[in-house]
Amino acid sequence: MGTTARAALVLTYLAVASAASEGGFTATGQRQLRPEHFQEVGYAAPPSPPLSRSLPMDHPDSSQHGPPFEGQSQVQPPPSQEATPLQQEKLLPAQLPAEKEVGPPLPQEAVPLQKELPSLQHPNEQKEGTPAPFGDQSHPEPESWNAAQHCQQDRSQGGWGHRLDGFPPGRPSPDNLNQICLPNRQHVVYGPWNLPQSSYSHLTRQGETLNFLEIGYSRCCHCRSHTNRLECAKLVWEEAMSRFCEAEFSVKTRPHWCCTRQGEARFSCFQEEAPQPHYQLRACPSHQPDISSGLELPFPPGVPTLDNIKNICHLRRFRSVPRNLPATDPLQRELLALIQLEREFQRCCRQGNNHTCTWKAWEDTLDKYCDREYAVKTHHHLCCRHPPSPTRDECFARRAPYPNYDRDILTIDIGRVTPNLMGHLCGNQRVLTKHKHIPGLIHNMTARCCDLPFPEQACCAEEEKLTFINDLCGPRRNIWRDPALCCYLSPGDEQVNCFNINYLRNVALVSGDTENAKGQGEQGSTGGTNISSTSEPKEE
């Protein structure tokens, strides 16, 4: 019996131990087991690839498992999400009340899985998404840099150097002639507006040379014969570089090193120094917005100032807003505000460009707009959240897309006639300019060239421009004022270059309903472009 009793005691002990290992113990037993269980979160779960990566950072085996890139998360300043469950679970035994601990027992693997699954998803998403920005950033950088590397230089792009972009120019050859004569090839016209006016006279001489060269190229590219075109371009290039060296020797500074040579050696030197011998330049990013179209409203309107009051009054008849919008259109309130403001502007402009009147009209109109905004239960304009105050006015002023009221004005350069330029001139546009002789030139270009096939329009317009300049400096010399003294220069490329820089560089092109503009200008035979000689837009 004694042996049987001892055996029964051993079996009872084993049964109790087995029941305790299966979670059937008391709350006290749970408090003893939970810390050990949470200590193993991350590797005590059944083996699976995702869970094998979720080792705590401070685990002794964490450095021996998982892919090599997983280790990068350990050196990041923010604590990893994988370590967070461990820190929270270590505090649970001390922080949880007793009644929480004696609740219904949970399976031992339920809590680790719930804690681990979120921590597995986020690191994987972060680590899969992290390389993407690096991959994206590695490609756009060269493109964004190249887009502006040949564009107009200024101090914001690293200061002025010893030469302008594209100088010296490449020598014309059969390899680059087509690129030289490409209609859409862009180049910078240099002058006081984009060159330093002190201590950099060598850049001014380079800019004048490039301007002179482009004028000659424009003339040569009109030759129908490829051979004649190439010979013409070569002569223009050689003359331009010879003129440059003459200008270099006319000052007391050290001349360009190629100018110290003579004849063919000088030309070969310039050719070897050319940074872009094939003239394959990227198009420079334009800061001039295209003429807007569609139902885009210029809202909020810019605050009237002494600087934009002329545009507000003198260009008011060219500003147009869409009509007949549906009554439910969300732009209706903005459209109504613009119409009311234009009506008030008309009253103020009749008082002699009254700035105080326009500013008060602007403020009152936007206050009424905000009143209508709050009359409906929709999203209200951000600025209307402010009460009527200078803060609200400043908010609207900052968000005005066209603070100068120049949405429908595009400044064009008639110095270089291209197919794209003719596309603007032959459309339903109005040209405004200070110079009284420009309307006649634009009229001739559009009336005689817009009916031709598109590829021939630019060539025709360039010939009309040269003819018109010769006429202005010839029989009609005394009927207009020439403040730049262009007609005193030698006829040809030098004279044309002077016109391009001083008279044709900035011409305002206005888009809109020009039929309502009364008593202004004339209309060409194509019915496309209206001409107006006025001092309203700013050209300089």
Swiss-Prot record:
What are the sequence repeat spans here?
A: 150-279, 283-405
Q: Where is this region: Disordered?
A: 41-85, 120-175, 515-540
What subcellular compartments does it reside in? Secreted, Extracellular space, Extracellular matrix
Q: How does it assemble?
A: Interacts (via C-terminus) with HSPG2 (via C-terminus). Interacts with EFEMP1/FBLN3 and LAMB3. Interacts with MMP9.
Residues bearing attached sugar chains per UniProt: N354, N444, N530
- Write out the GO biological process terms: angiogenesis; biomineral tissue development; chondrocyte development; endochondral bone growth; inflammatory response; negative regulation of bone mineralization; negative regulation of cytokine-mediated signaling pathway; negative regulation of peptidase activity
Q: What is this protein called?
A: Extracellular matrix protein 1
Quote the SUPFAM superfamilies the UniProt record gives. Serum albumin-like (SSF48552)
* Ranges where the record places region 2 X approximate repeats: 150-405
What are the entry keywords?
Answer: Angiogenesis, Biomineralization, Disease variant, Extracellular matrix, Glycoprotein, Mineral balance, Osteogenesis, Repeat, Secreted, Signal
Q: Which PANTHER family match?
A: EXTRACELLULAR MATRIX PROTEIN 1 (PTHR16776:SF3)
> Which GO cellular component does the record give, naming just one?
platelet dense granule lumen
Provide the leader sequence positions. 1-19
GO MF annotations for this entry? interleukin-2 receptor binding; protease binding
Main location per the UniProt record:
secreted
Which tissues and organs express this gene's product?
Expressed in breast cancer tissues. Little or no expression observed in normal breast tissues. Expressed in skin; wide expression is observed throughout the dermis with minimal expression in the epidermis.
Q: Could you tell me where the Low complexity compositional bias lies?
A: 528-540
Bias (Polar residues): 71-85, 146-156
What is its biological role?
A: Involved in endochondral bone formation as negative regulator of bone mineralization. Stimulates the proliferation of endothelial cells and promotes angiogenesis. Inhibits MMP9 proteolytic activity.
From which domain of life does this come? Eukaryota
Q: So which disease is it linked with?
A: Lipoid proteinosis: Rare autosomal recessive disorder characterized by generalized thickening of skin, mucosae and certain viscera. Classical features include beaded eyelid papules and laryngeal infiltration leading to hoarseness. Histologically, there is widespread deposition of hyaline material and disruption/reduplication of basement membrane.
Fetch the Pfam families from UniProt: ECM1
